[in-house]
């Protein structure tokens, strides 16, 4: 919408509004909904009360991550689930296959299956009618002020004022067109901001909600923000993205990504539990955040990354997974040998290793380009905000 740096700064200092309607949304309904999700996901769904949510993930029977997600408990028998857009078809097919006992969910005990199926609803499908939901994200220090400047009843206003992180409330606001907009408002987000909300709305009312929030946010310096700013914000915050810091070409697990606390081994069973635990009990890889030492330059370029990381002796110890320009310096994440994860540890990254032909030193000729390592420093895994 504007410059990525301006949108990034708006979220950190004021408020930004994101169109994330591409995210996948579904519902798990029925008296056995909690049992089903506890078997299918890594977190402990039964800990949730009405109006609470949790970060979680789907694993396959080999313990490989299929996707990460947020699970919201709307009622004891109704759970709202948000997944990555690029994985929705895969997730939907997998959950239906598990629900219908068309796949083996435990290689060591092939007889294990779902005994009490649930109802699965695709909330992106027009066939879901009034149940359809898409996501708009309102993030930044003034996000609550923007919401409270919208017209709503006293009950919803009071609920929003006291809403703790990861909880949600359902209600209505008056849209810019004068009609009511039904919402599920959760205090969640993927920008690293402590004040941030995701608003789930019927797609027919999404444009009205967008205009309503932009109008209410003018006094607070609101900016409409694109996905590039969302990416730079989550990188700065150290939040993993599927295919970059989760699974992907490096096969990164939640534990390696620093999100192992969301994997509840005390559950006697969830799909992939045994192989996941066996691998992660012995992994020697860990995700780190880093900052490039040089200021004012894009030392690392391109969106795919994969640049090799070496230690002070020149030994390859890892790979860059993401990087973004934040202010006047670059920050990123890399999967490295776990011995090099302490904050302050020096790293060296070869930014052009894949773009420059590699020769043996004795074959160098005048005019050849040689990739030089870029110094970087390990940061704390997650920033303190």
Task: Tell where the protein language model's regions lie, with residue ranges.
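Acidic active-site catalytic centers that drive phospho-/nucleotidyl reactions
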Residues: 19, 68, 198
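Preference for short coil/turn "hinge" residues that link or interrupt alpha-helices
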Residues: 4, 10-11, 19-21, 51, ...
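Conserved, structured C-terminal
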Residues: 75-77, 82-385
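Short amphipathic beta-strand starts and helix->beta connectors
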Residues: 4-13, 58-68, 176-186, 316-319
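Acidic, proline/glycine-enriched N-terminal capping motif
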Residues: 1-55, 64
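Acidic/glycine-enriched edge-of-secondary-structure segments
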Residues: 50-60, 158-165
């Amino acid at each position: 919408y504007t410059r990525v740096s301006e949108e990034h700064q708006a979220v950190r200092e004021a408020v930004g509004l994101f169109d994330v309607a591409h995210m996948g949304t579904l519902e798990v309904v029925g008296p056995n909904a909690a049992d089903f999700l506890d078997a299918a996901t890594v977190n402990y769904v039964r800990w949730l009360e009405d109006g609470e949510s949790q970060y979680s993930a789907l694993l396959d029977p080999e313990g490989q991550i299929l996707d990460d997600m947020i699970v919201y408990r709307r009622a004891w028998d109704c759970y709202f689930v948000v997944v990555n857009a690029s994985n929705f078809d895969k997730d939907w097919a997998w959950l239906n296959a598990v629900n219908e006992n068309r796949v083996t969910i435990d290689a060591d005990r092939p007889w294990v299956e779902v005994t009490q199926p649930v109802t699965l609803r695709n909330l992106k499908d027009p066939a879901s009618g009034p149940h359809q939901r898409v996501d708009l994200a309102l993030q930044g220090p003034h996000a609550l002020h923007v919401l409270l400047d919208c017209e709503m009843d006293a009950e919803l206003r009071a609920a929003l004022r006291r809403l703790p992180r990861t909880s949600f409330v359902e209600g209505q606001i008056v849209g810019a067109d004068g009609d009511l907009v039904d919402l599920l408002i959760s205090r969640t987000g993927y920008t690293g901001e402590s004040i941030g909300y995701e608003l789930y709305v019927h797609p027919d009312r999404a444009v009205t909600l967008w205009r309503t929030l932009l109008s209410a946010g003018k006094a607070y310096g609101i900016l409409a923000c694109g996905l590039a700013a969302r990416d730079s914000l989550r990188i700065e915050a150290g939040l993993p993205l599927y295919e970059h810091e989760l699974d992907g070409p490096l096969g990164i697990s939640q534990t390696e990504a620093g999100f192992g606390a969301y994997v509840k081994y005390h559950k006697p069973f969830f799909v992939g539990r045994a192989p996941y635990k066996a691998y992660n009990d012995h992994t020697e890889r860990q995700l780190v955040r880093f900052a490039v030492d040089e200021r004012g330059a894009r030392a690392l370029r391109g969106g795919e990354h994969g640049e090799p990381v070496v230690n002070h002796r020149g030994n390859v110890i890892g790979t860059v997974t993401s990087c973004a320009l934040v202010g006047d310096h670059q920050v990123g994440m890399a999967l490295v040998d776990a011995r090099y994860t302490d904050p302050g540890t020096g790293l060296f990254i070869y930014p052009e290793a894949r773009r420059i032909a590699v020769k043996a030193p004795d074959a160098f000729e005048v005019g050849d380009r040689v990739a030089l390592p870029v110094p970087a420093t390990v940061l704390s895994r997650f920033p303190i905000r």
